[in-house]
Amino acid sequence: MFLLHEYDIFWTFLIIASLIPILAFWISGLLAPVSEGPEKLSSYESGIEPMGGAWLQFRIRYYMFALVFVVFDVETVFLYPWAMSFDVLGVSVFIEAFIFVLILVVGLVYAWRKGALEWS
């Protein structure tokens, strides 16, 4: 309980980081002119009238590819701090990180075998 003052900078940053986008949306909502009409409700495609329907179905393969990318992108987020403090943490954290990477490699092999990485 006595160490809570060490987090004052964190809470201040969190509050400011939350208030900036809220204030930006609120101020733009107050100052922006409101114009409604058929031209405002129509689709816009590079300055020309849209051709065809706007709703397209994407193949599930794109979603699987994106999901695999996000998983390994998050892996990088977790491994970067570990790599920066590798010499301080010791062997036990190295073993934990190795197990983490091993689990992700098993997941990558599974996704590869299932064809989630095939683009064609």
Swiss-Prot record:
A biological-process GO annotation: photosynthesis, light reaction
Lipid bilayer topology: Multi-pass membrane protein
UniProt cross-references to InterPro entries, sorted A to Z: NAD(P)H_OxRDtase_bac/plastid, NADH_UbQ/plastoQ_OxRdtase_su3, NDAH_ubi_oxred_su3_sf
Annotated EC: 7.1.1.-
Enzyme class: translocase
Reaction(s) catalysed by this chain's protein: a plastoquinone + NADH + (n+1) H(+)(in) = a plastoquinol + NAD(+) + n H(+)(out); a plastoquinone + NADPH + (n+1) H(+)(in) = a plastoquinol + NADP(+) + n H(+)(out)
Sequence intervals crossing the membrane: 9-29, 64-84, 88-108
Keywords: Chloroplast, Membrane, NAD, NADP, Plastid, Plastoquinone, Quinone, Thylakoid, Translocase, Transmembrane, Transmembrane helix, Transport
Organism superkingdom: Eukaryota
GO molecular function annotation: NADH dehydrogenase (ubiquinone) activity; quinone binding
Localization terms from the record: Plastid, Chloroplast thylakoid membrane
Gene3D superfamilies found in the cross-reference section: NADH:ubiquinone/plastoquinone oxidoreductase, chain 3
Major subcellular location class: plastid
Pfam families: Oxidored_q4
GO cellular component annotations of the record: chloroplast thylakoid membrane; NADH dehydrogenase complex
Assembly notes: NDH is composed of at least 16 different subunits, 5 of which are encoded in the nucleus.
Role summary: NDH shuttles electrons from NAD(P)H:plastoquinone, via FMN and iron-sulfur (Fe-S) centers, to quinones in the photosynthetic chain and possibly in a chloroplast respiratory chain. The immediate electron acceptor for the enzyme in this species is believed to be plastoquinone. Couples the redox reaction to proton translocation, and thus conserves the redox energy in a proton gradient.
HAMAP family: NDH1_NuoA
Family membership: Belongs to the complex I subunit 3 family.
Name of the protein this chain belongs to: NAD(P)H-quinone oxidoreductase subunit 3, chloroplastic
